[in-house]
UniProtKB/Swiss-Prot annotation:
Source organism: Homo sapiens
Lineage, opening ranks: Eukaryota, Metazoa, Chordata, Craniata, Vertebrata
Subunit field text: Heterodimer of a C-terminal fragment N(TM) and a N-terminal fragment N(EC) which are probably linked by disulfide bonds. Interacts with MAML1, MAML2 and MAML3 which act as transcriptional coactivators for NOTCH4. (Microbial infection) Interacts with Epstein-Barr virus (EBV) RK-BARF0.
Homology family: Belongs to the NOTCH family.
Compartmental location: Cell membrane
The protein's name in its UniProt record: Neurogenic locus notch homolog protein 4
The entry's keywords: Activator, ANK repeat, Cell membrane, Developmental protein, Differentiation, Disulfide bond, EGF-like domain, Glycoprotein, Host-virus interaction, Membrane, Notch signaling pathway, Nucleus, Phosphoprotein, Receptor, Repeat, Signal, Transcription, Transcription regulation, Transmembrane, Transmembrane helix
Gene: NOTCH4
Glycosylation (residues): N664, N714, N964, N1143
One GO term of the biological process aspect: negative regulation of cell differentiation
GO cellular component, one term: nucleus
Amino acid sequence: MQPPSLLLLLLLLLLLCVSVVRPRGLLCGSFPEPCANGGTCLSLSLGQGTCQCAPGFLGETCQFPDPCQNAQLCQNGGSCQALLPAPLGLPSSPSPLTPSFLCTCLPGFTGERCQAKLEDPCPPSFCSKRGRCHIQASGRPQCSCMPGWTGEQCQLRDFCSANPCVNGGVCLATYPQIQCHCPPGFEGHACERDVNECFQDPGPCPKGTSCHNTLGSFQCLCPVGQEGPRCELRAGPCPPRGCSNGGTCQLMPEKDSTFHLCLCPPGFIGPDCEVNPDNCVSHQCQNGGTCQDGLDTYTCLCPETWTGWDCSEDVDECETQGPPHCRNGGTCQNSAGSFHCVCVSGWGGTSCEENLDDCIAATCAPGSTCIDRVGSFSCLCPPGRTGLLCHLEDMCLSQPCHGDAQCSTNPLTGSTLCLCQPGYSGPTCHQDLDECLMAQQGPSPCEHGGSCLNTPGSFNCLCPPGYTGSRCEADHNECLSQPCHPGSTCLDLLATFHCLCPPGLEGQLCEVETNECASAPCLNHADCHDLLNGFQCICLPGFSGTRCEEDIDECRSSPCANGGQCQDQPGAFHCKCLPGFEGPRCQTEVDECLSDPCPVGASCLDLPGAFFCLCPSGFTGQLCEVPLCAPNLCQPKQICKDQKDKANCLCPDGSPGCAPPEDNCTCHHGHCQRSSCVCDVGWTGPECEAELGGCISAPCAHGGTCYPQPSGYNCTCPTGYTGPTCSEEMTACHSGPCLNGGSCNPSPGGYYCTCPPSHTGPQCQTSTDYCVSAPCFNGGTCVNRPGTFSCLCAMGFQGPRCEGKLRPSCADSPCRNRATCQDSPQGPRCLCPTGYTGGSCQTLMDLCAQKPCPRNSHCLQTGPSFHCLCLQGWTGPLCNLPLSSCQKAALSQGIDVSSLCHNGGLCVDSGPSYFCHCPPGFQGSLCQDHVNPCESRPCQNGATCMAQPSGYLCQCAPGYDGQNCSKELDACQSQPCHNHGTCTPKPGGFHCACPPGFVGLRCEGDVDECLDQPCHPTGTAACHSLANAFYCQCLPGHTGQWCEVEIDPCHSQPCFHGGTCEATAGSPLGFICHCPKGFEGPTCSHRAPSCGFHHCHHGGLCLPSPKPGFPPRCACLSGYGGPDCLTPPAPKGCGPPSPCLYNGSCSETTGLGGPGFRCSCPHSSPGPRCQKPGAKGCEGRSGDGACDAGCSGPGGNWDGGDCSLGVPDPWKGCPSHSRCWLLFRDGQCHPQCDSEECLFDGYDCETPPACTPAYDQYCHDHFHNGHCEKGCNTAECGWDGGDCRPEDGDPEWGPSLALLVVLSPPALDQQLFALARVLSLTLRVGLWVRKDRDGRDMVYPYPGARAEEKLGGTRDPTYQERAAPQTQPLGKETDSLSAGFVVVMGVDLSRCGPDHPASRCPWDPGLLLRFLAAMAAVGALEPLLPGPLLAVHPHAGTAPPANQLPWPVLCSPVAGVILLALGALLVLQLIRRRRREHGALWLPPGFTRRPRTQSAPHRRRPPLGEDSIGLKALKPKAEVDEDGVVMCSGPEEGEEVGQAEETGPPSTCQLWSLSGGCGALPQAAMLTPPQESEMEAPDLDTRGPDGVTPLMSAVCCGEVQSGTFQGAWLGCPEPWEPLLDGGACPQAHTVGTGETPLHLAARFSRPTAARRLLEAGANPNQPDRAGRTPLHAAVAADAREVCQLLLRSRQTAVDARTEDGTTPLMLAARLAVEDLVEELIAAQADVGARDKWGKTALHWAAAVNNARAARSLLQAGADKDAQDNREQTPLFLAAREGAVEVAQLLLGLGAARELRDQAGLAPADVAHQRNHWDLLTLLEGAGPPEARHKATPGREAGPFPRARTVSVSVPPHGGGALPRCRTLSAGAGPRGGGACLQARTWSVDLAARGGGAYSHCRSLSGVGAGGGPTPRGRRFSAGMRGPRPNPAIMRGRYGVAAGRGGRVSTDDWPCDWVALGACGSASNIPIPPPCLTPSPERGSPQLDCGPPALQEMPINQGGEGKK
């Protein structure tokens, strides 16, 4: 090669390298300019740039015009969006080379340009046929786009859907381009280029090493002695000097410390940290910034015009401080790196500093002068010329216009133009304009109804009263004349005013001082003295107080002497003296001897208040009137002798005796004479016991003075003593020192007073000052009153304590400077006088600031006015008159002298100046202003002044008259007195005489009658003042006008239910009710607690306490708690709150009762709920029948057995050191606890497989139905409820368990058999509900709750309806029906015990009880059961129980009697032979059982697939598990599915009454219950059981076809037709499942009915209770014809979702329904829809190995790598479930193998865990696997769920269906398995669709005799879901041989009917399930598939079947 050629080649290579390394993007400053169409290039980092396009252009280089520039492009308010062409290299359809546009239309419009009005918000083309449209809540349509499309109307390609980014790049959709976020090591638009790290500067490897580039990374080739990714490790120990620059040396232990590493500080690198790298190598300094290297960083030194860390921020020069950049008003505009000035007109230059000469280009006319101005010019015209350019002739020289008009020249035509003065018109403005005449054709110029008066050049308005102004536009301010009295506020009103008077003044003008004494405020005849704004009361003696209302108690000072009693009187007192005293104060003693009361000869002795006669000898008595020896005083023969003032009767011998026997009376101070006492002097009384005069014996002690009384005496005690005889020492309280109602309390040193709240002080003499605490707010003044206080509020506040803000008004006088106030809704408004402003007119205006004076003067303000100081040469008020004569002034203005002054004014020379003498009505320096005659305010007393042409007119306020309203009229004329007061005129006003009850100047005030306290104090609650009256509100127990009458509160009989009423004064109601037994409450209206101290609400059960002395308790239902069952149910499971105490961790479990929990506890808290042992207070609560969770533990015998079903120690016999109670049922095996004594560790050590999912629901539905289901007769399936027990081996009385459960009757009906099955599965023994001799379930109400119940009653669906009514309604507290039931269950223990060592289960009932007690103790039993289990009683079955149940809750005698009767019934029942023919049929309420006339074989249908749709096509009890494909179906809550029994070949369609014969179908009588009247038309929508209508029954029974329903409907074709024609409702739905007739037509595959229902308006999108639409039901039932009908309906929502989010497409993919997946995709079903677990239809197809559906979904755009909520892909599910075909399909399309789920598992990992070796080989890339399956050794060879072929010798254990089995080796079968659902071949080729036993009683069709072809030429595959035939052994005309021994009995396989009525049988051909027989080799069931002659293909052991 020649050297020039070599040189040329090198040059080409260099150019190529430069082009390769050149960065992508634009380079600003290159040639040519990169930005087109005026775009600006902006530099970015790394030298790249971007174009900022000018308006109207777009694109990367602004190369495209913006189509949205046209504002009319999108019509009707649509928004326009420009769409750029797709970039090159993207996977998109061919796009145009010019941009397009997209119009986003408003709701209601559509079209490419939104030009069409849209009736339907979602037209078919709205989403561009690439998505589905649905309407949002706001009414706007919204599109759900298909994969690969995006945008509001799915019009944009989603370029990221194809994942264009390679090498792990993440695609970011930025339309119309994409952006790939590349991982480290890759770059490029699609991350397609590998970054060569070795070319970087500096390189990644240190000096002295070699760099080798790798894909996405690099590798450093280290010399000897260095190692590490970057050769950073050096051999040898750390050098003594260490590492440079502060680095840390660290030995590498993983290299045996033979290498060391320097850890460098920031800013240094290198093996020894010796290098400071240049950080400026890759700096990002922009815009000319200089990089300055630093330590581990760099700094950008920016030029002056840029700032920021990378000099990328522009400095805004326009905002910098300093002198402005732009002068002369120029505007500064910032730009990138600079600025520029936008100058105003006339200026130029960089900073607008140059003044441009505008006269250079001016065009002024010749002869004119141009004058330059700023930004303009002006032309100075010569005389006679005018115009802007002086180009027009001045037409005004001849003065053609009126003198007051303005003349100008028209700039266009050059003619004269007159601008008229106001009020004139015409060409020359000489014509007067009649404004009032114009008002007749339009609005009047005078407002508010003013009258218009035309004047020359103007008009005047005659205003109505109250208005003023030139146009009556202003409200006249009547307050301008200041009519109100000084100190008051004038309120301006419309045509009047109102004076707001201050306190103390009144009257219309506030001119009258208020007489506060007019209302007679002073009491007790006091004199009132009027004050200003107040009064003073001059009290009479004896009264005090502000109003003399307090009567002074003159008796306080004890003014009465000598024991006189003081009586207080108003203003005085009165002394009631004792006898013997007199005087005003009883101070004078009366001398009773002055009147000589004693007879002559007797001496009078004066005594205090009495006298005493000293009788002479021989006389006695008070007045000495009785002789001592009176006649007949002595007896005969006795002699009367007077001895010492005493008469003695002496016997003849001189001795006193000889008294007769009858004189034996007792005389104290006298002698007995003739049986009566003759008293001594001074004594009296029957026995002379009373001292006459009293004082003779000196009874008064301590020197007291005695005063005799008629009945005794009275002692006047000296100071310090008191009492009747002065014997008591007087205390300090005796004198009553406490005043004002205070109570006196003696004390050792004297006394102390307890004062009432109204007074205080040592003697309660001072009124309490309530104002001390300042209770008034907002500046209010506190006024103290007796016992209370009041607040006088400041201005603007109100309320009892002035706490409320008062809306301001003119009453607050807010206006200042004599302004006028006007009230308005917004508050007061002040009308300010001239010169003032502000809200309150408080601010003096600066009048000179408005420049009222011209430039030739100075303004000087004085107060609210101003005047002008004229400069030399000017004069006038405004200095606008030149200082010249009239002649000169007119000449200077070019007018006549007569026109100098306006309005006819006369110009008068005055010295050097002149002035205008104005005519009347005008003013001003030139007479230019009209004079306002009202300006001087001539009208008085609030009158309104109205200007008139000739003066003014005053409109007077009411009460005034005269020219200026100065004359006052009669003040009473306006009737100012209110409330019928009498008005009397007086000078200056009036006087109102008020009637009683009213006060005030105008009698406007109502007297508060309650001030005098008229109500009775003890019976009054409150006094209410009324208008001139009052009302007393009485306390309970009082009545009357003044509440003075007491009433009997018991008179109205307030006590209910026979309660006794007792009146009490202290109770709140005034009475107390003594209630009878059973009632309580204040009025005995509440029923007493029925359970001890509590009511059992919400169906709770009352249980007696087994512990003596403890009250009964409530056992609550449905999760309620608390002593009364009122506590709402707490969250089940783990809460919150967590049920585990002391930081225990909680895990949830499942069961019938909802989620349960299991606690994992720390060692210090080992209880079931992590409670600590030995809790306080547990001893007292142990054994009380209530489980206390805190006391439950082995230490306290599980709360004395309360928490363990009454068993104190369930683990009795288990070694205590093993702590097995703590390990029981914790999910882990503990060998030390795996024994019978330790209850088998709760079966944790063995986990046999659960019941096959396909059989679990079937076994649930057929549990204990009287038929042996061999596939269900396993421990994991519940032993079939004991149906398979041997007939002959049962004892007469078998083992049993009696359970006490708390369930409501409806719940018991629904959950009874579920309860038995759950316990059977839990205990692993056979359990069933026993029946009595009449075949009824042995279920009895709990005797303790309803003792009156008879044991004959059993479980009854109408239990609640038949309950006996209450004899007395109890309102809301009526207890619900009994929730407690005793359920007796039989137990099959034949497979347990020592005889069966392989079976580990409890072998006696006692062990069962211990096992259940242990589960209850650890909390594992409650969540498994539907309700609480309170007690269990086992019975071994050897003899009937003789005693009552030995548990605490059944301890009453009634319970014992009942249980004895229960035992007798059990014995009689078990003696009889058990019937095996059929199970008991329970019919729902409303159905009646038709009596059987003849026996018939029983038929039922076995399960046919794991989806179990055929078992019960109703709402599933359990939703589809997220990880499985099993969709268990069953009855709805509250729904039972019965089995209709077949009675031979059916001839009728049995409905509600199950009676034969359709009758006359058009009348629809057979479809409705009995009508009330035969004449009434039948109700076509009558509801039957579960809400079933006749239309539903007709759809269920089906359409008439050949071979189907022989004799159905008695020849009546299509039974729904007459119903729909008669108006039957097609939208009705059942109560339980919510299914409509269209649902039933889909479920039973009735295409004719479905079509007819759609025509009748049935809603195809109506969901049932599970959210399923008819399309869901049709897909699930494989009703293809119905599916096609629904898909053809435009109303059908193909993407409707159930409650779990399942769409019909997901259901079809999951159930492998043939062809429906493709049909749904063709109907635009969303292939990317997700359910609530995040799974798509492709996930479900992969999970069930539906390769056909998966292929169709992938072809429709399904995402092959979609991840669900657990981040599992379809490939992951295929690997987990062993779906080889789907996995091959996905791997062939490049599905990601390494995507992991949340647990970090990849598809290969889960395939390895599940032993799917064939899939593992696929995933590891070894190619497609062969048909093989490696069996792993183990117990029974382990499960093989995916064998491809079936061996005849290998049956599934238990029969049933084996989901997805592919290979079964000989002798190795899955336990609990069944028929293979995914096998590619089957033994018998039956009809695929529309026939078989699974098509709901329809006939089989299309089955070729002898195994001929099926309809449509298809061969039925077991992999198909939906209705599929069984491998049945057929006979009859189909030539099918018997299966078991050559014959199949029709009695063996009774038909299982659906819930909605009994349909006719498909035919008389029995369809048995797989024949299951025991295997003699392995003891497991075998699959007997009939003779091989009928098989279409041989089944080879270990190989594929060939067709």
